[in-house]
């Protein structure tokens, strides 16, 4: 396998997807208050054999306020990544997993997540801000 980049995504798939709106009253309440919902992202990885890594990218769209009535939306998206043999430095590996892989998979992940939100009765939802994973990484590093 020849890699022109420092990594290759061997597979990507939805590991878990969830939409929860308990009842019609909650749905009506959420429909009026969906603008308060926030998108949160978490990225975890675990090593597999043969320089492969499983990267789990989780998106949650949720209300941070303490309302009793709320909907909950979550997706866990997995990428199986083969890292080039030359990558030895932990920092380089972090950049690959937290920035490069994310930038590559995000269009599919975002589309799948938006489909979930739209099909859950919220067709007006748009994720206005594109996530800049490189910028996020730089902020966390400082």
Regions found by a protein language model. Give the residues of each.
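N-terminal intrinsically disordered, cationic/polar leader segments
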Residues: 1-142
């Amino acid at each position: 396998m020849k890699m022109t980049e420092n990594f290759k995504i061997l597979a990507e798939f939805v590991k878990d997807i969830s939409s929860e709106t308990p009842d019609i009253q909650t749905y009506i309440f959420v429909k009026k208050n969906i603008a308060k919902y926030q998108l949160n992202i978490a990225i975890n990885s675990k090593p597999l054999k043969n320089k492969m890594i499983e990267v789990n990218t989780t998106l949650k769209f949720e209300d941070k306020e303490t309302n009793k009535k709320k909907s909950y939306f979550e997706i866990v998206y997995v990428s199986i990544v083969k890292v080039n043999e030359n990558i030895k430095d932990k920092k380089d590996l972090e950049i690959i997993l937290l920035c490069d892989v994310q930038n590559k998979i995000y269009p599919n992940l975002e589309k799948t997540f938006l489909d979930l939100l739209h099909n859950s009765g919220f067709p007006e939802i748009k994720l206005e801000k594109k996530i800049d994973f490189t910028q996020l990484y730089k902020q966390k590093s400082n």
